[in-house]
Each structure stands twice: as structure tokens, then as C-alpha cells.
Amino acid sequence: MIMMPGRAVRRLLLSIGATLASAWAVPVSAGPLTYEQAVRLAAANAPSLKARAAATAGARSSAVAADRLPDPTLDLGLQNFPVSGPNAGSFTRDDFTMATIGFSQTFPNLAKRHARAARAAADIGIAEAGELVEGRNVRLETALAWVDLYYGERRLRQLDLLDASLDDLQKTVTARLASGSARPSQALEPDQLRAAIADRRAEMAAVVAQARARLARYTGDPDPQATGDPPMLDVDPIRLRAGIDALPALRAQDARIAVAEADVRLARADKRPDWKVGVTYGRRDPMYGDMASVGVSIDLPLFAGKRQNPRIAASESLAQGGRFDREAIRRELVAQLDADLADHAMHLSRLRNARETLVPLARHRAELDRDSYGAGKLDLGAALLTTLGLAEAEVEALNREADVARDAVRITITYGEERP
């Protein structure tokens, strides 16, 4: 039996422990994700959504103190201490000298306190609207990334099938070269087509990698995979137009208008006086006796025309501007929806044309040219071009299908319900 030194044993154990720790530290992939799973995972894990939720929680916490009274004030002092004359420096010779302690409390007028509460509630509304807007953005970007990844991988598989189909063509060329019915230069044409397919594949691989990176950003999965079927989303123009006013962008603007209106109320509340009450106790030499004082201070907004009224007018103008901005945002959303619906209808028509006409024609032509080449009636270059044309038609059909899916996702998430 071999005995290892204690130091060597410790090094071995440390090495094993480090290996196990590194194994546990590897992030676990969520595995293949369906469309719905990806959107739900992003809604749960996106840091930007957590940041918006924290901002909303902060606004709610801040609102608790919005309409409360300010903290009381403790006043400490020494009054009427002689610094010259026969009593200079003495605390007891002058009956006016005293040490004082007092408390004061400010009472803002009720209109101001209510306006502050309304302002805090409006701040909560802005935070909540921001959370809704960010949630919709996260869901939209996640959904589009999943669609791009799904169709990008399908297009890659289509190109792989085309590349594999060239093997049969290569065998035909080899046989014709052996029989002397083909020129030696024609043996290079399948390789040229493979090179063209490789270029297309490299471009599509970059698209897939970019989509996977975008999906990883929102889901937190370091290597997301798209699985399942693409979403089947119903685009209902009537329902979408009817729900325009409930969209997060308009709700956010409504919250900003509420803030401006609360500022108007605050400006108007400044025309009402605030109160301050104070109590002071004065400690003097026992031979004179102690003293107490009670006082009330009242603000006098006597010059409203030069102070409060201009601020009120400015706040009202900002609120009115917010209402105009809301109408501008609404019109922009309506125009964007109409434009997106028009694009969707166009992409649907193009997809239908590709499926029903372009791809079947390209396939039939490729079959005819392949048979003609096999019969010696067509040169290899023409046969390869029609084969490449079929591949391009099939990839283009996938492109058009992806356009339709992207349209449906963008329209339903941007203008539709809050949840997919």
C-alpha cells in the first residue's frame, strides 16, 4: 500500500474540491424553450423589470410620508445675557437673563397636504406605468428574438438539405465524366454551388447567433434553444383599435398629466397660509422666577399676483401641454397600428404567393431540368442554377413566413393584451 505524504493528500483534496466547486458553479441551461416559456422566463428574470419594480416600491414607500406633518423643532437658547455694563458676564444679576428650551410645530394648510398626497399617488402611477412599458418591451424583444432564432435554425436546416442533395448530382457528374459525355470543367460546378451555399449558411449562422444572444439577454439562459411551434396569434384590427387608450404608453402619459395636475394643486395651495405654533420655557435665577412663552406664526401670502399666481399659471400650462402630448401619442399609436396592419396584410399576401406559386413552380422546374440533364438534353450549369433557384425559393418562403410571424408578435404585444 502506497502512503502519500500529508501535504500531498491535502493538495489532492483541495484539487478535488475545486473541481467539484467549478462543476457546481456552471450555470444550468433552461434547456429548449417554447415561445410561451421564453416570454414567461424573460418576464421573471429581466433585470430591467426588477429595476422598474424596485422604483415602484420606492414610490409607494415615499408616498406614506407625503401628507404627514413635518417634524417638530427643538429650540435651545440663552437670552438676554449681559456682555457689558455692571452685570456683564453674570447669569444671575439681570432678571432678563434666562436659559430657554422650546418646541415648535409647523402645520401646512390642508390643501397643501392633500396636494402632496395626490402628487405622491401620481408618482406611483408614473412608476407603475414605467413598469408596464418596460414589461411590454421585454416581452416584445424576447418574442422577436425567439421567432428570429426559430426561423433562422429552420433556414439553416433547409440549406443543409440542399447541400446534402448535391451528393446525388456529384455522382451523376462523375458518371458522365467517366463516360465522356461531360467536360472536365463541369466537375467543378457542384463545388461552386456548395461554396455559394456555404456563404448563405455563414450569413444565416450569424443571424442565428445574434438572435440567440438577444434571447439570452432577456431570459438569462446562456444558451437558449427554440423548440415547439411558432405562436399562432390572431390579429384582430377591430379589437386592437378599440384598446388603444389602454396601452401602457398612454397610461404613462396619463400618469404624467396627473403629476402636472397635482403640481397645479400644490401651487394653488401656496395661496393659503401655513401655521406654526411654538412653546418656550425660560429658566432664570430662582430669585426672579421662570417664564413661559407661547406663540403662533401665520404665513401671509399677500402678494399672490407676483408670487403664487405665476407659478399656478406655469403649472396649468404644463398640465395642458401634457394633455396635448397625450393626443399626439394617441394619434401616433393609431397611425403606427394602421401601418403595421398594412405591412402584415402585405406579408401575408407574399407568403401565400410563395407557398402556392413560387415554390411549387421552382420545384417543378428543378425536377424537369434534373431529368433533362440526366437525359443529356441540358448542360450541368443550367441544372445547377435551377437547383439553386429552388433552394432560394424555399428559403425565401421561410423568410416570408418569419415576416408574418414577426408582424403578428409585434402587433399583438404592442397593441394587444398585457400578457401573451
Cite the ranges covered by each PLM segment.
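Periplasmic alpha-helical coiled-coil/stalk elements that build and connect Gram-negative outer-membrane
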Residues: 2-5, 33, 134-246, 340-347, ...
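N-terminal signal peptide c-region/cleavage motif recognized by signal peptidases
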Residues: 22-27
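Bacterial Sec-pathway N-terminal export signals of envelope proteins
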Residues: 28-78, 83, 106-107, 115, ...
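Short flexible linkers and secondary-structure junctions
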Residues: 31-148, 152-163, 167-170, 184, ...
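Hydrophobic/aromatic residues within transmembrane alpha-helices of membrane transport systems
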Residues: 42, 103, 149, 215, ...
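Amphipathic alpha-helical coiled-coil segments
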Residues: 49-66, 127, 134, 138-159, ...
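Small/polar, glycine/serine/threonine/aspartate-rich low-complexity segments that form flexible
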Residues: 75-107, 116, 225-233, 276-314
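Short, charged, amphipathic alpha-helical segments
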Residues: 117-121, 184-192, 313, 380-388
